[in-house]
């Protein structure tokens, strides 16, 4: 089905995503399956073994036929969009390593998502975002800054304004961060090793000297990074990878709460982590699946005991 050169390039691409881009296993498996499906379709479409010539010659008709096939195979919109992202990623890799250029592939727009999507992102969408956010930045320190900031927001449920106000003084404790939130209300939030390590790496690469009480996240001119600047990076990310329109820095705070709830955390704990005054705010803030609510109801209602 595939000639030897294509097989070798796929192996190199997989190693690149794993070792250099540090993609999660979940994304690696998904992307590999998406590319496999695409190449199998190309083999069927051309009735011939897939070669570099066929890869280079992929046109609008082939791409649209493949996307239509995915839809007929009952792939959901997010999976179709992810598949297109995987193919674009592979072609981007081929541009760098094999000098193969195909502008048609990059011109294909991802399928639009429903306007009624909840504000939280799915775990898959979060994984894609964390894996790809480093691709947006004109220098290495900005790339690692973007990832460190996004991981911190999602790992700790911070508001973008809170994350951008963090200084070296906040980072002295290896297990907790003290945050001054809305209404000058201080809260203590655990932070994960992955966030600590990324911030440490970012500070090592940061080309500007900082005082201990200065915010650590800086713009390219060395000034304090502003929310609109970071959100512009996220806009590039969601457009290229077909992620939901509501994706923003704040949607990762929503996702933090939603995913904790779906994995068994109680609302009171989430309320404390988010810094909400009332529990009702937390309830409306999180995305709770019907299945989760149904399970909680059946398990907890006294009449069922």
Swiss-Prot record:
Q: What biological-process GO terms show up in the record?
A: cell division; chromosome segregation; DNA transposition
UniProt cross-references to Pfam families, sorted A to Z: Phage_int_SAM_1, Phage_integrase
- Matching InterPro entries, A to Z? CB, DNA_brk_join_enz, Integrase-like_cat_sf, Integrase_catalytic, Integrase_recombinase_N, Integrase_SAM-like_N, Tyrosine_recombinase_XerC/XerD, Tyrosine_recombinase_XerCD
Name the principal localization, coarsely classed. cytoplasm
Q: Which superkingdom?
A: Bacteria
Which ranges carry the Tyr recombinase domain? 116-298
Q: Where in the cell is it found?
A: Cytoplasm
Kinase as a keyword of this entry, yes or no, is no
One GO MF term: tyrosine-based site-specific recombinase activity
Complex and partners = Forms a cyclic heterotetrameric complex composed of two molecules of XerC and two molecules of XerD.
Which family does this protein fall into?
Answer: Belongs to the 'phage' integrase family. XerC subfamily.
Q: Name it.
A: Tyrosine recombinase XerC
| Source species of the chain | Rickettsia bellii (strain OSU 85-389)
Instruction: Identify the gene encoding this protein.
Output: xerC
